[in-house]
């Protein structure tokens, strides 16, 4: 099957993205990123939201065409400081341009939709509210674009009931029924850390 993800949005809700990376650009050098919402930035947030800054495809292309790194950073100042979001985006949708087509992602023909989640500090994790806002944004944006969306959530914490009853779990279950979307949640990131225990209270 020649499935490339063409006509589909690939959403990455994570630590950001290196939007200058060649794997996220078209052969002519323009961006493959449909939109980028940085929840941590000061600027013009997406319509209906009260935080962060939204960068459109046009903004990103303008930044990519800038003559200096300083000018590029002034136009679209987003950074992915720990690289997690960039790595995830590459696995999902990298087109392999930086490796001569060898290392391509699962959907190299898709457009990217990126949310850099807000965090209380650089070494912390986003709150569940940031994740919920990110999910809301990418699904609304997919509806506006008229395209199905595959959403990856693999950056965050392991809080919650883990039985489907928490607010976040209920929210994900609800929004998964809206529009044409698939929400993929990482599991097992804590490995053998034994962060959860089962017990009977007497």
Name the predicted role of every residue range.
Residues 2-129, 146-148, 164, 179-180, ...:
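Subtilisin-like serine protease catalytic core
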Residues 119-201:
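Substrate-binding/access-modulating region of protease and related hydrolase catalytic domains
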């Amino acid at each position: 099957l020649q499935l490339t993800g063409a006509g589909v949005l690939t959403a990455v809700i994570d630590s950001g993205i290196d939007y200058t990376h060649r794997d996220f650009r078209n052969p002519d050098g323009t961006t493959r990123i449909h939109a980028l919402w940085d929840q941590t930035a000061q600027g013009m947030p997406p319509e209906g939201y009260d935080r962060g800054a939204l960068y459109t495809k046009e903004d990103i292309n303008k930044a990519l065409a800038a003559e200096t790194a300083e000018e590029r950073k002034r136009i679209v100042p987003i950074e992915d400081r720990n690289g997690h979001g960039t790595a995830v985006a590459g696995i999902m949708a990298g087109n392999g341009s930086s490796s001569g087509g060898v290392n391509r992602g699962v959907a190299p023909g898709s457009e990217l939709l990126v949310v850099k989640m807000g965090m209380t500090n650089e070494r912390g994790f986003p709150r569940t509210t940031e994740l919920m806002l990110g999910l809301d944004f990418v699904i609304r944006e997919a509806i506006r674009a008229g395209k199905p969306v595959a959403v990856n959530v693999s950056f965050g914490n392991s809080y919650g009931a883990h039985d489907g009853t928490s607010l976040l779990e209920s929210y994900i279950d609800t929004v998964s029924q809206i529009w044409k979307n698939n929400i993929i949640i990482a599991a097992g990131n804590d490995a053998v850390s034994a962060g959860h225990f089962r017990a009977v209270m007497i």
